Amino acid sequence: MFEINPVNNRIQDLTERSDVLRGYLDYDAKKERLEEVNAELEQPDVWNEPERAQALGKERSSLEAVVDTLDQMKQGLEDVSGLLELAVEADDEETFNEAVAELDALEEKLAQLEFRRMFSGEYDSADCYLDIQAGSGGTEAQDWASMLERMYLRWAESRGFKTEIIEESEGEVAGIKSVTIKISGDYAYGWLRTETGVHRLVRKSPFDSGGRRHTSFSSAFVYPEVDDDIDIEINPADLRIDVYRASGAGGQHVNRTESAVRITHIPTGIVTQCQNDRSQHKNKDQAMKQMKAKLYELEMQKKNAEKQAMEDNKSDIGWGSQIRSYVLDDSRIKDLRTGVETRNTQAVLDGSLDQFIEASLKAGL
């Protein structure tokens, strides 16, 4: 005979948690807005404004993630209750086990939705840019920057995010000097914002014929993409715009025209650049978008006094602001802020970062 009371208690618990989320996530307003967005996307002329249509499509995906999940929770809990009744009436353990398995799946789905409460920042739902910069140390540091790039690309892929290399500077022997990656997806900035900081690698260097232990540093800087309708005033007189020929690995030029664009904001010293398109105009637009995002982040720093110290670290990462240590000799990766540690170093370097990211978000970093 199977024990039904614990299962009924779980159903009651999940129902209550689901009801709390409905209020917290403003289910009714989101459902109403989803209907409005769907109606707008069904209009035949919606694609006359492609950017508007894309924004609506993205909003719909975000709304559906909440509305559909909560709808599925409600229906799923009703279905499980029905299965339990059948199992009891027929004294059928197989049906009972099926109900428990469905309940497990529903609880996992609800836990994922509950985690969204970590994303309370104004721009947590935005796409983002990730800048990786090799520290001093030549080839070893540049190889480490390349390993970080691969790690974050793998992580983004595992979450279903879209990635685009905006700008990449190749290392002289191996690896990269720097890279800017655009990461697009639901709550991309919210997920990655706590990854800003210095990452420290300790290993026996493959570039050292003596196989000696080396310590290398690379920094990561995450900032949100700012919508075009955000009011950031940029005085054209404050900008220096340089064009140059795009180059690939080894320094060879990949085209004969000066299509690559570098923009410098003279008052702040902020630099953005783009060379991933053959069109100079498109590269300039992308570089301006990044500049707008970086200047917006700077404004947010000024306005938010409580988080000033943390934001200063984001905009000017010092090599002392380490967030994570990767000691490959000892098979140990440790987050220096949360204390989370793992010995499965290869899995982390292959993109298994959620345990670190979730811990830092829960800690309110």
From Swiss-Prot:
Positions of post-translational N5-methylglutamine modification: 252
Keyword entries, A-Z: Cytoplasm, Methylation, Protein biosynthesis
SMART domains cross-referenced by the UniProt entry: PCRF
InterPro entries membership: PCRF, Pep_chain_release_fac_I, Pep_chain_release_fac_I_sf, PrfB
GO biological process: viral translational frameshifting
PTM (free text): Methylated by PrmC. Methylation increases the termination efficiency of RF2.
GO molecular function annotation: translation release factor activity, codon specific
Keyword Cytoplasm: yes
Transmembrane segments: none
Subcellular location(s) per record: Cytoplasm
GO CC annotation: cytoplasm
Any Pfam family the entry gives: RF-1
HAMAP family: Rel_fac_2
Note: The gene for this protein contains a UGA in-frame termination codon after Leu-25; a naturally occurring frameshift enables complete translation of RF-2. This provides a mechanism for the protein to regulate its own production.
Record family assignment: Belongs to the prokaryotic/mitochondrial release factor family.
PANTHER family found in the cross-reference section: CLASS I PEPTIDE CHAIN RELEASE FACTOR, PEPTIDE CHAIN RELEASE FACTOR 2
Function: Peptide chain release factor 2 directs the termination of translation in response to the peptide chain termination codons UGA and UAA.
Protein name: Peptide chain release factor 2
